[in-house]
Amino acid sequence: MDKLLKKAFVAAAIKFPSALFGMFCIFSVLVILDITIPAAATSLMNFFQPALLFIQRWLPLFYVPSLVVLPLSVKDIPAASGVKICFITAGGWLASLCVAGFTAIAVRKMVKTEMTDAEPMAKPSPFSPLEIWAWSGVFLVSFVVALLYRTALGTAARTCLPFLLASTVLGYMVGSGLPSGVKKVFHPIICCALSADLAALAFGFLSQSGLDPVLGYYLTKVSSNPGAGDVLMGFLGPVILSFAFSMFKQRKLVKRHAAEIFTSVIVATLFSLYSTALVGRLVGLEPTLTVSIIPRCITVALALSIVSFFEGANSSLTAAVVVVTGLIGANFVQAVLDKLNFRDPIARGIATASSAHGLGTAALSAKEPEALPFCAIAYALTGIFGSLFCSVPAVRQSLLAIIG
């Protein structure tokens, strides 16, 4: 469905994210079925449940390609600009967290809606030793084949795809199994990216081709000659489509706490977009780089669609900044929420997801399951509203005017 919509939107020259349109369609169908034939809506949800669990289990993996090819993305960025981007990323995360959290608390005090139990959310199964051994076998065999026969699968990128994909998956599996104390410093995504980079470095050294060409094979951005990163990023569209099911499942919660959720998410999203543009101009960051990091708090799946609205944006930098924002949130969100005295699960969930999207959500919900439904809703809505705002020409022009 994602690919069909993408082709249709390209053919019609429509700039709006096709997956987001598909998400709205799925959500509408589920709502209509729930009103007219409730059993059909339940059957549809049950039918897609395995796919939703698959996405939930592997979601962080789909963010990794931008980190793996980061050495290529930052090559032409001056060191001074890199420092400014880091400042905006870290400071922006904290500011967005505060804005979303304080807005949620203020609205909660006004509406005084009592919390009720949310719909339980299924958890994916942990990785088994058999899976780790299977992927290890794929890595070893495909690595040797790629070394001996550089174009065994037609092109160098296709030939390198199996071992680069296997190294990425293995890194994620190993990282996911680390003790929670280690994960705070060495997040599974970092482990995952390092694993892929080490595999690329080893292949580049043994084949005498160097690291850069192998990283180029990892993410080619050419559909006819995909690399491992292209395969993983191909799941970003289905991730957006899956938002429809999570929002439908928590529809009663959304309806009950609509004031807190929608107000906080809209305010936080607008603040994130415009504050990034303003601070980028104040610190003298190049306009093309500022444009590239505007959707820093929005999930990669939609952040890439947002920067496609702007000319000259570096999409690889966009993805990297979004992932780094999520990693900052994953490592520090709980401590910062405690320091800010945010005790309400709704405020904690919304603040986390609005500032650090899926990675922050995963980190907080692992220890505070009561915040997970609000994280999941805010995570989806932040991306949706960010895309909707940036699809409006007047909003894009105002952002560009601020950037200069």
Describe the predicted segments one by one.
Residues 1-71, 84-96, 121-248, 253-272, ...:
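Helical membrane-embedded segments and adjacent short helical loop/helix-boundary regions
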Residues 2-6, 75, 97-105, 109, ...:
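Short helix-terminus and kink motifs of transmembrane alpha helices
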Residues 7, 197-198, 274-278, 282, ...:
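Alpha-helical transmembrane segments of multipass membrane proteins
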Residues 12, 37, 75, 81, ...:
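Membrane-interfacial segments
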Residues 48-77, 117-130, 232-235, 289-328, ...:
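Alpha-helical membrane segments and immediately flanking helix-loop junctions
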Residues 59-60, 88-99, 271, 299, ...:
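Membrane-embedded alpha-helical segments of transport systems
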Residues 135, 171, 238-244, 369-371, ...:
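Membrane-embedded hairpin module used as a gating/binding unit in multi-pass transport
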Residues 218, 246-261, 278-286, 305-321, ...:
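Helix-loop-helix hairpins and the membrane-proximal interhelical loops
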